[in-house]
């Protein structure tokens, strides 16, 4: 929050922007249930884990990712990285975004949904849109 406050207080209007504008991006996995969203998020989580190790592997399917052999250290790292993503039902994710918008005061939020299949991505975006339009 402090960095946003510094930005707002230090902002100098220019030809390009007359007011400060804060845009944030969320990596999300949204499904009908939290459990399904967790399951579908595993490929993204395993990819991040491998990237942290400098490994570039093909993206795993949810089935492969959930069967991926994890060490205790891997599990700890996944747990530490968990706050970097919003995972849950549409209601849970939208509530978290709204809470953070109220706290941080950002002007715009972009959603990045890198689920394994295009149908999973479209469903995630559809569920979010429906919840946001309630």
Regions found by a protein language model. Name each.
Residues 1-134:
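Active-site-adjacent structural elements that line small-molecule/cofactor binding pockets in enzymes
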């Amino acid at each position: 929050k402090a960095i946003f406050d510094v930005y707002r207080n230090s902002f100098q209007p220019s030809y390009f922007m007359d007011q400060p504008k804060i845009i944030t991006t969320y990596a999300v996995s949204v499904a009908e249930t939290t459990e399904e969203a967790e399951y579908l998020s595993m490929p993204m989580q395993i990819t991040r884990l491998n990237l942290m190790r400098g490994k570039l592997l093909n993206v795993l399917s949810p089935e492969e990712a959930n069967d991926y052999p994890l060490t205790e250290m891997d599990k700890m790292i996944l747990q530490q990285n968990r706050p970097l993503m919003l995972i849950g039902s549409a209601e849970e994710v939208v509530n978290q975004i709204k809470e953070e918008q109220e706290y941080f005061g950002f002007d715009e939020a972009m959603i990045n949904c890198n689920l394994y299949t295009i149908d999973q991505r479209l469903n995630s975006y559809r569920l979010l849109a429906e919840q946001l339009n309630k």
